[in-house]
Amino acid sequence: MYYSIIISLIEVVLVLVPALLGIAYVTIAERKTMASMQRRLGPNFVGYYGLLQAFADALKLLLKEYVAPTQANIILFFLGPVITLIFSLLGYAVIPYGPSLAINDFSLGIYYILAVSSLATYGILLAGWSANSKYAFLGSLRSTAQLISYELVLSSAILLVIMLTGSLNLSVNIESQRAIWNIFPLLPVFIIFFIGSVAETNRAPFDLAEAESELVSGFMTEHAAVVFVFFFLAEYGSIVLMCILTSILFLGGYLSINSLDVFNFFYSILFNIGFIDLNFFNIFYYFYKEIFVNNSIIEGLIYGLTIGLKSSILIFLFIWVRASFPRIRFDQLMAFCWTVLLPLLFALIVLLPCILYSYNILPVNVL
């Protein structure tokens, strides 16, 4: 009993520590990328090329004096950011970083991620209401309305993916893309899902919950020092999680190009032009297969690097969108969800099963 608990704790640490480190470096990447787009240098003093800037900022916030409003509900004021951070990190428990490389790869993984991401709304609502501030309360209401609305967009887009794969299990969704990634037959759905992900994570141009010109800093206006770090980590943790989920649903997750196929392709070219002989190929092929293909450690690293690379590209798109587009009005944001995205998704939900059924490729467990 105790042994299994210790193993579970080790698994949680092995997943969350790299995730938190990745979140820290996403903040640095965002600042450096936006600086490059705006012809600035960005952070470049703390550490080599500014690589330790996030840790310096975290230390600064941890050492700051914590101040709370006198009329605030102190317990809920502290509890709101903690709840938001916990639910933003719970989604990492079902992410498969490779075959059988997940804390708990159970059959309802997609449903679980949608559930815990929607529960983070309670933390934002508690934080805004308990601060006893008009700006914080209005920001929390805006954020709640936005998250609930775009949760429908994400759920509807995921439903279209499930129609192709026939499962709510993340690993099954990845393995079903060995022939072709879902982004190719479902490109419009991918675009809608990406837009919904940007809105779901309160990122520009959909960051209406913390619009500086209207709400000072939204639901986190009164929070400072350590509890502000919780909100900060929760926001960027949600960004990384949504990018990983997008790469799993549409970009094949940890699946990469078969290295043996690439090897055979280049060998056939070199052999046909007489650059190498057959004996050299057999020796090199044997060592290559033993070191890179049959080695479970190397294979696991390749899986992790693959899903990390795909997620990094999507994170860059998040940053690119933030640096390129102006903030829209809140009524435009909600109208775009309810009058454009959702009707379009409902039309696709009706159209896609008809196409799949007419070609007899609808998964059996969806019928």
UniProtKB/Swiss-Prot annotation:
It is a multi-pass membrane protein. It comes from the Eukaryota. This is NADH-ubiquinone oxidoreductase chain 1. Disulfide bonds: none annotated. It is found in: Mitochondrion inner membrane. One of its GO terms (molecular function) is NADH dehydrogenase (ubiquinone) activity. Its EC number is 7.1.1.2. Core subunit of the mitochondrial membrane respiratory chain NADH dehydrogenase (Complex I) that is believed to belong to the minimal assembly required for catalysis. Complex I functions in the transfer of electrons from NADH to the respiratory chain. The immediate electron acceptor for the enzyme is believed to be ubiquinone. It catalyses: a ubiquinone + NADH + 5 H(+)(in) = a ubiquinol + NAD(+) + 4 H(+)(out). Belongs to the complex I subunit 1 family. InterPro entries: NADH_UbQ_OxRdtase_su1/FPO (IPR001694), NADH_UbQ_OxRdtase_su1_CS (IPR018086). One of its GO terms (cellular component) is mitochondrial inner membrane. The gene is ND1. The keyword Transport applies. Keywords: Electron transport, Membrane, Mitochondrion, Mitochondrion inner membrane, NAD, Respiratory chain, Translocase, Transmembrane, Transmembrane helix, Transport, Ubiquinone. It is an enzyme of class 7 (translocase). The chain crosses the membrane at residues 5-25, 43-63, 74-94, 108-128, 152-172, 179-199, 225-245, 265-285, 301-321, 336-356. GO terms for biological process: aerobic respiration.
